[in-house]
């Protein structure tokens, strides 16, 4: 992504500036946060992941773009304080919603995926 944006590996300031765009929801007009009760384990965390995937697919069907942002979990204390969430809640992620900027170079990125048969076995 950084190469696509013309940000050299050694330009730490530019890399940090790009990362910080997470915390502006990449300019999206709408966003939300997802919390999980601290007592919940991996099954409930995966439930939330499946819910988010479904939400993202439904948003796409409605002509909207989304970006799941795990980066927000690093800001748990700040977000929890601002939203006045309970002590039992832990921030899982944020998600921004809107229409992608077709002119933004970063939105042309299509990361390579390993072929299905290299990571999945069907029996």
Describe the predicted segments one by one.
Residues 1-123:
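Acidic, surface-exposed loops and disordered segments
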């Amino acid at each position: 992504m950084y190469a696509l944006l013309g940000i050299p590996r050694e330009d730490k300031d530019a890399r940090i500036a790009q990362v910080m765009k997470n915390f502006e929801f990449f300019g999206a007009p709408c966003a939300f946060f997802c919390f999980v009760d601290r007592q919940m384990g991996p099954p409930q965390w995966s439930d939330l992941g499946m819910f988010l995937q479904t939400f993202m697919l439904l948003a796409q069907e409605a002509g909207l773009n989304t970006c799941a942002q795990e980066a927000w979990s690093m800001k748990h204390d700040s977000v929890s304080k601002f939203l006045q969430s309970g002590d039992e809640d832990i921030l899982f992620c944020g998600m921004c919603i809107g229409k992608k900027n077709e002119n933004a170079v970063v939105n042309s990125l299509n990361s390579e995926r390993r072929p299905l048969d290299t990571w999945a076995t069907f029996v």
